[in-house]
């Protein structure tokens, strides 16, 4: 075996061992267009907007910094966020990965909660739909992918939806 093919075989084995698949019949994942569709998110973003006032709660300003980065290998995106909603410090981290023709996104917030969403991408429109049926967000990418216009909604019954916040994220890097 030539040194080049030995190195290639060793590299393939390392990938299989790291993925826990060395002795399974699972196919090694292949990065494809579904992964590439997430590339528009990659970068540093400044998020500004406000919550939508209710009869009981006034509007609160939102200002956060969001960073989307590829996890090594390019199969997953990690999203970190921190900032303020009103006077409250907020933050968290999520991992976004391919799940069939859509994506799974689990966000772990600074209050100890985990929020699972299904992300669907249709051209410049990205829709996050909470698996619990209580939250959803529609993002329209504009300015060649440099701006995200996001409309968040919540529901107590999964049928009737109420606007909860509107924000604009601008890519700074």
Which residues make up each language-model segment?
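Beta-sandwich strand segments
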Residues: 57-59, 159-163
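Beta-rich strand-turn-strand
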Residues: 140-146
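Conserved Ser/Thr-centered positions that define the repeating blades of beta-propeller domains
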Residues: 153-155
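Central antiparallel beta-sheet cores of small beta-barrel/beta-sandwich binding domains
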Residues: 28-35, 47-49, 53-136
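Residue-level recognition of beta-strand termini and adjacent short loop/turns
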Residues: 72-73, 143, 173
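Beta-strand/loop substructures that line and gate deep hydrophobic ligand-binding cavities in soluble
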Residues: 147-151
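Amphipathic/hydrophobic helical signal segments and adjacent flexible N-terminal regions
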Residues: 1-63, 67-69, 168, 172-173
């Amino acid at each position: 075996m030539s040194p080049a093919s030995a190195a290639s075989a060793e590299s393939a084995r390392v990938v299989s061992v790291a993925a826990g698949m060395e002795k399974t019949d699972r196919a090694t994942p292949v990065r494809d267009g579904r992964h590439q569709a997430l590339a528009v998110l990659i970068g540093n973003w400044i998020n500004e907007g406000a919550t939508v006032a209710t009869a009981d709660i006034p509007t609160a300003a939102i200002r956060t910094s969001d960073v989307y980065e590829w996890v090594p290998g390019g199969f997953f995106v990690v999203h970190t966020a921190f900032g303020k909603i009103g006077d409250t410090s907020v933050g968290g981290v999520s991992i976004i990965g391919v799940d069939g023709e859509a994506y799974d996104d689990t966000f772990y917030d600074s209050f100890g909660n985990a929020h699972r969403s299904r992300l669907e991408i249709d051209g410049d429109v990205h829709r996050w739909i909470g698996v619990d049926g209580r939250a959803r967000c529609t993002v329209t990418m504009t300015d060649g992918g440099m701006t995200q216009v996001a409309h968040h909604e919540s529901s107590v019954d999964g049928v009737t939806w109420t606007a909860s916040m509107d924000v604009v994220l601008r890519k700074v890097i």
